[in-house]
């Protein structure tokens, strides 16, 4: 399992991602019940040319994670109605088609250890972590691509 990274500070430099015209669009499932956080994250991620699908509760997210739609990354809050984010990650890690998918926990509560135990690759603390999304996702996707080569 990949070592969990915790990022809680502000970043001074601006990060950007390279989107190649022939490259497939990155697809992200974002599970977040706070409309403001979901909107800000969507704006940041879509500015990179990435496709974002948002779920507002854990039960709907559980169905999507269990389904066959391909996601390049799961971005999950912990405090959700229905199934919590750590339960979603634990479930996803048990699925053949999701076990290698990069997973990021973006949460307000200090649950780094619990996120590690559940199988998260990275823990980002709200609100500071929102500014680290692009850099973090680029790094995780780059690491996954190297593993696949």
Question: Where are the language model's segments positioned?
Answer:
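Acidic catalytic/metal-coordinating carboxylates
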Residues: 57, 84-87
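Acidic, metal-coordinating helix/loop segments flanking the phosphotransfer/catalytic sites
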Residues: 54-73
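Conserved acidic carboxylate
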Residues: 32, 107
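Alpha4 helix (beta4-alpha4-beta5 surface) of REC/receiver domains from two-component response regulators
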Residues: 87, 108-126, 131-135
């Amino acid at each position: 399992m990949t070592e969990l990274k915790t990022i809680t500070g502000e970043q001074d430099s601006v990060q950007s991602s390279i989107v190649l015209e022939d490259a497939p669009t990155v697809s992200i499932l974002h599970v977040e019940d706070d409309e403001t956080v979901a909107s800000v994250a969507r704006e940041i991620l879509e500015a990179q040319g990435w496709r974002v699908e948002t779920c507002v509760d854990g039960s709907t997210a559980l169905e999507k994670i269990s389904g066959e739609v391909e996601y390049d990354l799961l971005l999950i809050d912990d405090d959700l109605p229905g199934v919590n984010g750590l339960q979603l990650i634990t479930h996803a890690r048990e699925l053949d088609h999701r076990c290698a998918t990069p997973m990021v926990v973006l949460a307000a509560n200090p649950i780094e250890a619990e996120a590690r135990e559940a199988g998260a690759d990275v823990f980002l603390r709200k609100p500071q972590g929102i500014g680290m999304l692009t850099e973090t996702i680029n790094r995780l996707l780059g690491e996954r691509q190297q593993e696949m080569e």
